[in-house]
Amino acid sequence: MNRSLLYPRATTTRRLIGLDGMWRFSFDPESKGVEAGWALDLPSSLSMPVPASFCDLFTDKASREYCGDFWYETSFFVPAEWSGWDIVLRFGSVTHRARVFVNGVEVAQHEGGFLPFDATVTNIVRYNQFNKLSVLANNELSETMLPAGTTRTLADGRKIAAPYFDFYNYAGIHRPVWLMALPKERVLDYSTRYRLTETGAEIDYTVSTNGPHPVTVELYDGTTRVAESSGTTGTLVVKNAKLWNIHAAYLYDLVIRIHEGSAVVDEYLDRIGIRTFEIRHGRFLLNVSPVYLRGFGRHEDADIRGRGLDLPTVKRDFELMKWIGANCFRTSHYPYAEEIYQMADEEGFLIIDEVPAVGFMQSTANFLAANQGNGRQQGFFEKETTPALLKNHKAALTDMIDRDKNHPSVIAWSLLNEPQCTSAGTEEYFKPLFELARRLDPQKRPRTYTVLMTSLPDTSKGQRFADFVSLNRYYGWYVLGGAGLADAEAAFHHEMDGWAKVLHGRPLIFTEYGTDNLSGAHKLPSVMWSAEYQNEYLEMTHAVFDHYDFVQGELVWNFADFQTTEGILRVDGNKKGIFTRQRQPKDAAYLFRKRWTTLPIDFKKRKK
């Protein structure tokens, strides 16, 4: 099997053609397309951009809220000179599931809307001709998938998604599509692990191929080769190594080759950063130096294109994070596009990488019910659907780690977001996931999950598995919000005193906290939803953080306003953004800029 999640690269032995652009598109509410032959001829004149979500491109509500099967179609040309190579189609993501057809022949199926998959079509394509590519996608939700939810049928017969999570269920081909010509024998994967030495650094590597020929690995600093080795496992010794660091990213070029005599059978290139990351004595250590995490939970979300990859938006987001003094973000609540990790590698940002395990609390208003204990069912991990859910969870976790393990920016894995974890089935569900993450990652990054409001130090059955504890807390908003901030602060301290007793030397970070603020809403004296209240809440919350030495990071919710399912508690989406959805600063952005640009990088490096 030639499964590979390596990012597509053009090299001396590999060829790429991007298939992004305007495709044809059709809804298939009756799921009749396969039998009707739509894989060969899509009966639609609709055009649709790829990558993008389809939802916000329409002006009618039925199209925006469509739930069910839908089709994409395009054509691609295979040059005659590609004959003799493996021809592979590669999708960055299709949300949430896909069946892929080439010239009417089904070549792939994939479940999960946030990670890549490919299909070898060598024996299907016609050379020196155009070939038809069709994708049957589906965006229905269920309790066996990540993220979790359900699908219900309206009185008029239309399906509608009912997510258990608080972000909009955008759908479509969200990331780039590539046509690749690859050598028959090729590099399938590689992994690295770093050690710092008195004279530089050592890089232990492993390379996976699908053939018998020898492998060489070289490391370049610009045009200068600084280390080399041979074999599918080995060590690169780098003298006077330049380390990758926060806002001072230094990247080397890694060159992996397969040789047959004097000929190069395959060549794969990537960029890596030499750095170590660990937890020691309750501190996060980057290159053996303490680092206090500051930044955001985010979403892949923007006007019009929805969750589709948009590089100008990505660029703007990183510029704003640099301006405000952030050094870290969580990929809430799913793995992001690979291009975002590449930019984090280049800009020197830290990433907590999160698998799309969200909505594991049965509620159609998860953001409120989960935090107030009103979920309709507490035992989410004791259901008939649990075995299938766990299987899909393991598959997504495996793909995420395989895809992202070589990024220097990735410092930790988040295995779940706000699961219901106070019932008996929690430990049986959590244990194999945390063990799998440890086994798969050659760098043994720390593992965590985000703890919702109703999971307290003495009730959470999952926190013992985490290498560091990540809390989502909203004292002063969902809990004791309004004029009684003093009560919120007292309750917050009471809970934190409880966590101090169960951490056992582990650090704790906040992966969510915040209030909604309608941009431009001012009120004196303050009221909830105003800029003044948001700032008062943040000042109170930060004072609590600063009181506890074991708090080692703060990732506010959210970087920018984002779209959600409509409802009486959401004013055209979630307004907790420090920036607007159009990426302009709210008043709170200046509060964070003052705080984060003055806090030392090793804030709280010594125990009190």
In which residue ranges do the predicted regions lie?
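Secreted/periplasmic carbohydrate-active enzymes, especially glycoside hydrolases
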Residues: 1-343, 347-351, 396, 411-412, ...
